[in-house]
């Protein structure tokens, strides 16, 4: 399977987010970055695992995303790997997100980071944390689907 899908190239994927959270809605957001961060992202040195987004003062912030320092530039001009980065969303999207996060107690999680027409984009999702029994149910359902597919394939 190719990394290129409909004009964008996926750089990092947070697969664990779909296991830990029930995804309700997804949004595409731009991200405010420095030059060395963009170079490092293009090299694929990003970790989204522990990241989450916060809404503060009417703005969205991406927290705890690790972007490794860029090796070609010295230590002096490099960025801090886990700094807080601003997400760029439309005002209407921000209002909608603020309402849902504050009233319904939902969480904003980054699902994937990709390049779209040369710009770095982050796919963020409104998610509701799963309990242990929900995770087990999902695993059981997935296993049952695989068994059904195997049985259908043999006939």
UniProtKB/Swiss-Prot annotation:
GO molecular function: RNA binding
Domain of life per record: Bacteria
Residue ranges crossing the lipid bilayer per the database entry: none
Pfam families reported for this sequence: SmpB
Location (main, coarse): cytoplasm
Record localization: Cytoplasm
The entry's keywords: Cytoplasm, RNA-binding
Chain residue ranges for the region called Disordered: 136-155
Gene3D superfamilies with a match to the protein in the record: 2.40.280.10
Keyword Cytoplasm found: yes
GO biological process, one term: trans-translation
GO CC annotation, single: cytosol
Keyword Lipid biosynthesis set for record: no
Role, per record: Required for rescue of stalled ribosomes mediated by trans-translation. Binds to transfer-messenger RNA (tmRNA), required for stable association of tmRNA with ribosomes. tmRNA and SmpB together mimic tRNA shape, replacing the anticodon stem-loop with SmpB. tmRNA is encoded by the ssrA gene; the 2 termini fold to resemble tRNA(Ala) and it encodes a 'tag peptide', a short internal open reading frame. During trans-translation Ala-aminoacylated tmRNA acts like a tRNA, entering the A-site of stalled ribosomes, displacing the stalled mRNA.
Protein family (similarity comment): Belongs to the SmpB family.
Name of this chain's protein: SsrA-binding protein
